[in-house]
Design a protein with these regions (language model features):
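Long, low-complexity intrinsically disordered regions
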Residues: 64-77
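Basic/aromatic-rich interaction segments and small domains that mediate binding to polyanionic partners
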Residues: 2-65
Length: 77
């Protein structure tokens, strides 16, 4: 079960938010008995890229067998 402050993996692209399937975020709020989540996506330095409300089917918990990769972003100054 996903808990507040758990890392999650995005299962769908969210191009309007600059997010892609596989991006990792942190759950900052849980809605309606785990039907939805508020998730923050950030850079390694802690700069917020996006905060998005997602439905349960759009995320999954990050697992011990998951391998992370790096995507360089061009953030507005």
């Amino acid at each position: 079960m996903i808990k507040e402050y758990n890392e999650i993996v995005l299962l769908v692209d969210k191009p309007k938010k600059g997010l892609m399937r596989g991006d990792v975020g942190i759950v900052v709020e849980i809605y309606d008995n785990h039907e939805g989540y508020e998730v923050e996506f950030m850079t390694k330095e802690g700069k917020t890229v996006a905060v998005v409300t997602l439905e349960a089917h759009e995320v999954r918990p990050i697992g011990n067998k998951d391998m992370l990769h790096v995507l360089e972003l061009e953030l507005a100054a």
